Structures are given as C-alpha cells and as structure tokens.
Amino acid sequence: MENRNSFLQNFRGETLGNISNESSSEEIFQNKVLRPILKLQNDLFIEVVKNQINKHKNDFYNFPVEKKLAYIEHIIKNDIKFRNSLKGIIISLFTIDEYNDYIQNSSNLNKRMMNMLIERIKNQVQLLDVVIAK
C-alpha cells in the first residue's frame, strides 16, 4: 500500500491553504487532502457537472447568472446520486490513512467537501456555458 499512498500524495501536490497550531483536524484535512484533490480534479468536475446539466435537459444555458449559481448548488446538494458520484471522485484519491481519518468524521467532512466543490464550480460558471452537443 505504501506505493499507492506515496503516489497519491505526490500526484496531488502540496498542501493548499494555511495550517497552524490552532487549526482543527477538519481544517488540516481540508487543506492537506481536500483542496489538492479538488484542484487536481477540477476539469473532471466541470465535465461531470456539464453532463448532469445536459441529462436534465433544462434551460440552464439561458438562465441568468444568479439562477445558474442557484441551480449548481441545488443539483449538488439535492441530487443524492450525483452528490455521491462527486464524493466518489474525491474519496478515490484518499490514501488509506486519509480514508481512515475521513470515516471518523465523515459527516462534517462531507459538508466541507460539497461546500468547497459548490463554490469552486460557481466560481467557474462561465466554463459550463459550453453546450455539449448530443
């Protein structure tokens, strides 16, 4: 397992964000594990969200920006299958130790994970405007 763990940590890159003596275990996990994974998987998340939008065949591309932002938040928070798929993309890049840390506090870490992902996608909403031809 050490090869996989080393590979994943090197592949993801350095810690993003500040870690101090006052940082909670959740903040440390967020900055050491979640942020690098979200950054690494960013392009995939954009494509996955585009696909989800197109599957629902709504009028997303004609929505005003505020409604697009609300829709992004809605599909990530309320579509359980979709949310679980997004979590799987993230969790699959955990080391065994990170996974063991994660399961100790998965509820709070899931909230952090999804909130960070929602903000990341919202900040890049213009990338979703490229319609996928089906």
Regions found by a protein language model. Give the residues of each.
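Long, highly charged low-complexity segments enriched in Glu/Asp and Lys/Arg with interspersed Ser/Thr
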Residues: 105-134
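Short, well-structured hydrophobic secondary-structure segments
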Residues: 30-61
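N-terminal leader/targeting peptides and immediately adjacent processing regions
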Residues: 1-35
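Amphipathic protein-protein interaction modules
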Residues: 63-113
